[in-house]
């Protein structure tokens, strides 16, 4: 059905010509240009009244806008004429006009003010937005400029297929990352902190201004990498007792099958076991270990919410999102205050400093005294020592708990592997007591841990860095200062050239590798290198991996000698989800069934 009369009327009303694609009519007084996106062809093709209604609605809205602007300009001219003798400035006239509009139509004035503020924020956001890194560097952008996908691993796989030996850019939680291929691993690990800093990256990623993560001092770094690593062997016996206390508290005796939330239990067990070494059993057994278990979650939830927040609003919302973290930190500092005061007093009043630095059986580690000995005069303040202790708790808890989490699910699905490890434990213990060593004797267990870490790493990337000055690598363009870059280790952990059948979990994979000539000390859980990329490598590799290795083995020994594990009926091992920042997040609700062996 056609409506020729209506078509002609509309055409005459808006002044269309048959050849026009864009039309403009100008008001002779104010020069107001009204662009109407229509054409005679579109009008001619209208066969439905609804299409005509849309056109009429557009014309009406344009006409109303024009009338409103005419009225506003008319009021402005009247005010200028009326107040001309007073010689008011334009800004004063604008304020008078705004006051008049507010009196005449307060609702419209408020809406206009809100729209103005929103428009101002949008304009500032656009004007201050940095130039896209892919255009600046000339590198391909994979996954789009606003990658917020749960299947982030597929983005990386697609990028590596398209550019197997070249760097590309991904947008990781709103920030551009230059992702280098595995072939650049050795080159990047050799970079000094003055060239590219891992600490700067973690400070940026976890909002270190609010969380203190990434503020590790050289004294703290050396304390963890040297003093704490050496303390692993002497505290094995003590840590076994602490692990027993933790499991008795959160798992207990299970004559019948009983399921537990693995992530929740392991966070508390690790926090309590490690806490006994750092702050003492009595303090750790109180509220301390609960706060330590909460600490990482308060950081990660705040970071996730800020990722979803428009960049312009983040400075205003950061304090709000980190309020739970502030409360946890405040409570932890209050608990630490008397402990640190005692350690500072003992250090200042005793002449034999070396004696105070020794690890003593059944006592908490002299952790604060190690730190004091490495700080310069006046640097080891109570606040600094408390910050170091909190950062240590943050970094040593969730990574260790997650590693045990994944291992327990592998064991629960393999009863024969549990029996095999129990036999190895029996061969290396006396009355259930582990030797006071670094526990390298548990080679099968170490292989199980290393393979689990390969299959379930913390992230798709490693060797995270932020450039501190312009940097030219052997591949790709020159990176300006402040650029985030990393190495794609997803394609190292899943390389069929390095690991035959990489998608299969082989608990003996690294045990077999270590049996090859010259490789008996390689391929361990704590190893670093191009085949062992998850802890990083070089001078900026994770310094706490030796302490974590000790804690994990002690906890696994306790579980395997006390419990039988199995998956819930009809359930399979939970699959982690790859988040838009490249990290793998486990199923936080997954459960495993525990049953006591006797």
Swiss-Prot record:
Its cofactor is heme. The lineage of its organism: Eukaryota, Fungi, Dikarya, Ascomycota, Pezizomycotina. One of its GO terms (cellular component) is membrane. SUPFAM superfamilies: Cytochrome P450 (SSF48264). One of its GO terms (molecular function) is monooxygenase activity. This is Cytochrome P450 monooxygenase phmB. It comes from the Eukaryota. Heme binds at residue 542. Keywords: Glycoprotein, Heme, Iron, Membrane, Metal-binding, Monooxygenase, Oxidoreductase, Transmembrane, Transmembrane helix, Virulence. Belongs to the cytochrome P450 family. It is a single-pass membrane protein. GO terms for biological process: secondary metabolic process. Pfam families: p450.
């Amino acid at each position: 059905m056609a409506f020729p009369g209506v078509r002609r009327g509309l055409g005459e009303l808006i002044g269309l010509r048959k050849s026009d694609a864009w039309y403009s009519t100008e008001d002779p007084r104010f020069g107001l240009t009204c662009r109407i996106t229509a054409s005679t062809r579109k009008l001619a093709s209208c066969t439905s009244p609804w299409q005509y209604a849309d056109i009429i609605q557009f014309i009406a809205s344009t006409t109303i806008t024009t009338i409103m602007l005419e009225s506003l300009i008319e009021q402005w001219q009247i005010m200028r004429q009326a107040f001309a003798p007073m010689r008011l400035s334009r800004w004063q006239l604008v304020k008078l006009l705004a006051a008049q509009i507010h009196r005449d139509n307060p609702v419209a004035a408020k809406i206009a003010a809100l729209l103005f503020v929103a428009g101002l924020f949008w304009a500032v956001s656009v004007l201050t937005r940095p130039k896209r890194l892919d255009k600046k560097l000339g590198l391909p952008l994979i996954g789009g400029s606003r990658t917020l996908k749960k299947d982030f691993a597929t983005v990386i796989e697609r990028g590596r297929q398209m550019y197997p030996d070249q760097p590309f850019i991904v947008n990781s939680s709103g920030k551009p990352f230059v992702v280098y291929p595995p072939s650049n691993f050795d080159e990047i690990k050799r970079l000094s902190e003055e060239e590219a800093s891992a600490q700067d990256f973690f400070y940026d990623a976890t909002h270190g201004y609010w969380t203190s993560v990434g503020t590790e001092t050289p004294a703290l770094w050396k304390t963890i990498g040297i003093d704490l690593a050496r303390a692993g062997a002497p505290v094995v016996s003590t840590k076994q007792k602490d692990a027993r206390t933790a499991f008795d508290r959160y798992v207990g005796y299970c004559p019948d099958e009983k399921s537990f939330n693995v992530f929740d239990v392991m966070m508390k067990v690790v926090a309590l076991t490690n806490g006994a070494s750092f702050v003492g059993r009595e303090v750790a057994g109180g509220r301390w270990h609960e706060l330590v278990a909460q600490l990482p979650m308060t950081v990660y939830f705040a970071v996730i919410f800020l990722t979803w927040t428009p960049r312009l609003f983040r400075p205003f919302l950061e304090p709000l999102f980190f309020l739970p973290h502030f409360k946890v930190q405040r409570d932890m500092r209050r608990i630490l205050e008397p402990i640190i005061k005692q350690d500072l007093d003992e250090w200042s009043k005793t002449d034999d400093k070396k004696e105070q630095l020794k690890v003593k059986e059944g006592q908490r580690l002299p952790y604060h005294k190690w730190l004091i000995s490495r700080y310069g005069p006046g640097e080891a303040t109570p606040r600094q020592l408390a910050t170091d202790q909190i950062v240590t708790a943050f970094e040593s808890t969730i990574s260790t708990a997650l590693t045990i989490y994944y291992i327990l699910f592998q064991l629960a699905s393999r009863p024969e592997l549990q029996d095999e490890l129990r036999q190895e434990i029996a061969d290396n213990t006396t009355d259930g007591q582990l030797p006071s060593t670094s526990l390298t004797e548990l080679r099968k267990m170490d292989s199980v841990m290393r393979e689990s870490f390969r299959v379930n790493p913390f992230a798709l990337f490693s060797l995270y860095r932020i450039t501190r000055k312009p940097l030219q690598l052997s591949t790709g363009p020159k990176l300006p200062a402040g650029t985030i870059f990393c190495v794609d280790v997803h394609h190292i952990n899943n390389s069929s050239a390095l690991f035959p059948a990489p998608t299969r979990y082989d608990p003996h994979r690294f045990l077999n590798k270590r049996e090859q000539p010259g490789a008996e000390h390689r391929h361990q859980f704590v190893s670093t290198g191009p085949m062992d990329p998850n802890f990083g490598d070089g001078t900026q590799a994770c310094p706490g991996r030796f302490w974590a290795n000790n804690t994990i083995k002690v906890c696994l020994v306790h579980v395997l000698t006390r419990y039988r594990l199995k998956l819930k009926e009809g359930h399979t091992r939970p699959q982690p989800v790859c988040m838009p920042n490249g990290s793998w997040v486990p199923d936080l609700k997954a459960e495993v069934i525990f049953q006591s062996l006797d």
